[in-house]
């Protein structure tokens, strides 16, 4: 299965075989020396050109390749390590360990290109996935095997929310997480690794990085590398896995770069004509089966804040819930800075979450919306000009705002407050009490950065005695 290179165009390499035609997505190895240093480059077949010639995408830099160079087809797609051995380690797109640690002690490998679970194997039951984060569980609950879009600019706390979710899954569900850095900044990937190490969650997560400086093939396929590791835990171990993709926009962006290099005619805004199909290929594999589930949280970058751009628009079609982080909320010192009016969930329905949950969540949103509407009047005329009823709404809304904040386990080193996991029952009990006016006589400071309502009452007692 030997062949030779006939053309190199940046990350696209044409290869010719004398008596063999590799299948689409098959891996091809090229071993060559650059300045005396041995290099192993992996190519992936993307198109058949006829006459036993194939067009491939390189998974690493192609500097040093020359025409006529020998290559060897593997006869199978790229395979990556799976199983418990991958936890706490960092991998690149081809499954090599890149954290400078000891070699991997496992021979178990799975191909990155796999079929999505069939209809009969999928689980049709919609279950809520408890995260232990009050604002998420109350306003925009995640569903098991669902997909969540995490929208937010730089510095509003996307990474901290991701790390807390990884911690809570490990702590409450004894589950594992997989993090795929798709077109990530190397610095951010490095920071995340060290923060997870300090936060004590590294041994429950596998990290896969295809950074910004890598060719489009690596940035595109890294999502499949991470997903394959997650699928193993779901299908073989029967676990509920959490899968993080940061950033899903870069997956679409790298696909558009590859498409142009492969000579396909671009469609709207220069994106690949196969954008919807490629997005579906990835997203359809993220689902619940009868054995376990993969719940994914995907950070979504919105170019120029244009939600109608084809890339984010192709993601929206697949999302079950959106968690929107707002800078205005983080400026108030309320963390997590989730916008309770901007975040949505498909399962916030009385038939799925229950009548009480739905009633409390909509009640909270109504009070916060009323407070938002009154803010202009308060800014111009002050609180004294409001009616007694409106004053009560404002007081309750301010308590709700503060009660939506929560000390995180992974942020203990910054806040000095021990982290709190709040069950859904405790969350509903607390917000229901505020809406009913049970805690109207308690100062709003008592609700800031606490877990359940009991802690708020204890804090109020301490403030009173101080």
UniProtKB/Swiss-Prot annotation:
Belongs to the ATPase alpha/beta chains family. Its main location: membrane. It comes from Helicobacter hepaticus (strain ATCC 51449 / 3B1). Its EC number is 7.1.2.2. It is an enzyme of class 7 (translocase). This is ATP synthase subunit beta. Produces ATP from ADP in the presence of a proton gradient across the membrane. The catalytic sites are hosted primarily by the beta subunits. ATP binds at residues 152-159. One of its GO terms (cellular component) is plasma membrane. The gene is atpD. Keywords: ATP synthesis, ATP-binding, Cell inner membrane, Cell membrane, CF(1), Hydrogen ion transport, Ion transport, Membrane, Nucleotide-binding, Translocase, Transport. InterPro entries: AAA+_ATPase (IPR003593), ATP-synt_VA_C (IPR055190), ATP_synth_F1_bsu (IPR005722), ATPase_a/bsu_AS (IPR020003), ATPase_alpha/beta_chains (IPR050053), ATPase_F1/V1/A1_a/bsu_N (IPR004100), ATPase_F1/V1/A1_a/bsu_N_sf (IPR036121), ATPase_F1/V1/A1_a/bsu_nucl-bd (IPR000194). It catalyses: ATP + H2O + 4 H(+)(in) = ADP + phosphate + 5 H(+)(out). Signal peptide: none annotated.
